[in-house]
Design a protein with these regions (language model features):
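Conserved ATP-binding/catalytic motifs of P-loop helicase motor domains
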Residues: 1-139
Length: 139
């Protein structure tokens, strides 16, 4: 097998059960008892952003709660410099929201951003639905 590195982007969306299955599959395919069959694993993502996507009718389990996470992940590098937001005050507000710990000042600042939208054309805002059941009931 030629694969040397497996990169998993948005690892927060990978269910723990799937992570364990991938690890086992890699060991079997490569006939190698090391984690992921000796394939170097590079995972990226923010567990505060996108939750795991489990199989239907099963509770989600984060990849870091999987049985094989601790043996598969050797090093963790925390990236804490924000590149996409240049306003440090707003970046701090977004980080508070990300952590779910908003100060009263941040809540007030977000409330001040609320305003009625005035459409001068016939276009309406797009509605996004997380679950098909909710979408079906909205028609």
């Amino acid at each position: 097998m030629r694969t040397k590195v497996l990169i998993i982007d948005e690892v927060s969306m990978v269910d723990g059960e799937l992570f364990d299955k991938l690890e086992e599959l890699a060991r079997k395919i490569r006939n190698n008892g090391r984690p992921f069959g000796g394939i170097q694993l590079v995972v990226t993502g923010d567990f505060f952003q996108l939750p795991p996507v489990p199989e239907s009718n099963r509770e989600a389990k984060f990849a870091f709660d999987s049985a094989t996470w601790n043996t598969s992940i050797q090093h963790t590098i925390l990236l804490n410099h924000v590149f996409r937001q240049k306003d440090p005050v707003f970046a701090s507000m977004l980080n508070e929201m990300r952590l779910g710990k908003l100060t009263p000042a941040t809540i007030d600042a977000f409330k001040k951003l609320s305003r009625p939208l005035d459409f001068h054309d016939s276009l309406e805002a797009t509605e996004l639905w997380v679950y098909q059941v909710k979408f079906s009931g909205s028609i």
